[in-house]
């Protein structure tokens, strides 16, 4: 439940950050930095509180404990990547640096749409515990990674040709890199959640069989 909540919050923060940087909305970005730092602290608290949870899972087998640790680690990586997007974005706008170019804004808009679709599918899977969409998520992730790679290459070409603003380019490339990290770790979290659920269901089946024998 906590993982689902934090993933949904991360989805909202990312989308609002991309919109706020388009509009150069300083106040919104300041609030989003605070929210992303809050979710990062929450993920670290989950990590710090692993031992009590692992003790509760002790009787459930080593595999469940391992997958739970992985889930918490991936969630922390997602939250950290989000901070690495919101913080420099706010600082860029707060320091009155030049905003993103039309090309950068257009590319980020498409990437934001892709991220929203991927995270929407992941959140739906986490809530319903129905993993039938997992191959579709993998396919969407690969398409997004190809888009990010092509977009990064285009930006490097523009930089080499002396086009655009250096600080805006650095911010743009940072957002692209951290977006890739966010999606990569979200997919990893989903895989860990699937294995966790499968082992939990298998163990519950064994427990029911033993009790009925």
Where are these regions (language model features)?
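Cytosolic, long alpha-helical scaffolding segments
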Residues: 1-213
């Amino acid at each position: 439940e906590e993982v689902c909540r934090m993933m949904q919050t991360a989805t909202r923060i990312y989308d609002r950050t991309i919109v706020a940087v388009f509009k150069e909305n300083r106040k919104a970005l300041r609030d989003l930095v605070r929210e992303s730092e809050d979710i990062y602290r929450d993920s670290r608290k989950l990590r710090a509180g692993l031992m009590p949870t692992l003790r509760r899972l002790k009787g459930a087998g080593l595999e469940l404990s391992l997958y739970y640790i992985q889930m918490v680690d991936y969630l922390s990586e997602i939250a950290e990547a989000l901070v690495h997007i919101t913080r420099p974005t706010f600082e860029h706008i707060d320091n009155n640096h030049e905003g993103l170019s039309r090309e950068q804004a257009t590319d980020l808009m498409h990437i934001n749409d892709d991220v929203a679709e991927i995270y929407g599918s992941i959140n739906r899977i986490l809530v319903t515990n129905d993993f039938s969409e997992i191959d579709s998520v993998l396919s969407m992730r690969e398409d997004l990674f190809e888009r990010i790679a092509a977009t990064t290459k285009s930006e490097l070409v523009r930089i080499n040709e002396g086009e655009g603003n250096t600080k805006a380019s650095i911010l743009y490339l940072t957002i692209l890199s951290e977006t890739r990290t966010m999606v990569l770790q979200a997919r990893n979290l989903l895989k860990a959640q699937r294995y966790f659920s499968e082992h939990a269901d298998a163990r519950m089946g064994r427990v029911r069989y033993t009790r009925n024998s």
